[in-house]
A protein has these predicted regions:
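Conserved alpha-helical substructure of the radical SAM core
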Residues: 1-23, 30-39, 45-46
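Conserved AdoMet/S-adenosylmethionine-binding subsite of the radical SAM
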Residues: 30-162, 167
């Protein structure tokens, strides 16, 4: 948090006008919540005009929504690559949730449920939501229309689909 706050201040001073601070890693900002919350608090105290944004996969997000609203986080970006757990198990073979590792279809079902809950809670809290999806040829390319329908129905104001471009090694 100290290093992040220093870097934000330096960039904000060098590149006006400043608009948005997004936390997107390392790791998942909603999962490593103590560091994310502290970074947001320090930056907001020193640069109150800066808008705050969180990027996450949504797994740890539902419990953070009320705090995000209280901290005046302007918007949240959630990466959602599937809404069918059968598709999801090929993309997300495992997750770590509730202090344990989940694998396969169970992992994809949990991730999907948590992502949809996150979108619904963010919409209820009037926090703008953008969804990013990675289109993976042969895995979820035929599934993007379903993803789009599900996320926009739950309040996403923008759905950004980005193709995975794999290169041979």
């Amino acid at each position: 948090p100290d290093e992040a706050a220093r870097k934000v201040k330096a960039v904000a001073a060098a590149v006006p006008p400043r608009a948005v601070l997004g936390i997107a890693g390392p790791g998942d900002g909603a999962y490593d919540w103590a560091k994310t919350r502290e970074t947001f608090a320090r930056v907001a105290a020193e640069l109150p005009d800066l808008k705050l944004c969180l990027s996450t996969n949504g797994l740890a997000l539902p419990e953070r929504v009320e705090e995000l609203k209280a901290m005046n986080v302007a918007h949240v970006t959630v990466t959602i690559n599937m809404v069918d757990p059968h598709v999801g198990e090929a993309i997300h073979p495992w997750i770590f949730h509730d202090h344990r590792r989940h694998t396969g279809l169970e992992a994809a079902r949990i991730l999907h449920a948590r992502q949809m809950e996150s979108l619904e809670r963010l919409a209820e809290a009037d926090i703008l939501v953008k969804v990013n999806s990675v289109l993976i040829p042969g895995i979820n390319d035929d599934h993007m229309a379903d993803v789009h329908q599900a996320v926009t129905a739950r309040g996403a104001f923008l759905h950004n689909i980005m193709p995975l471009i794999a290169r041979a090694e």
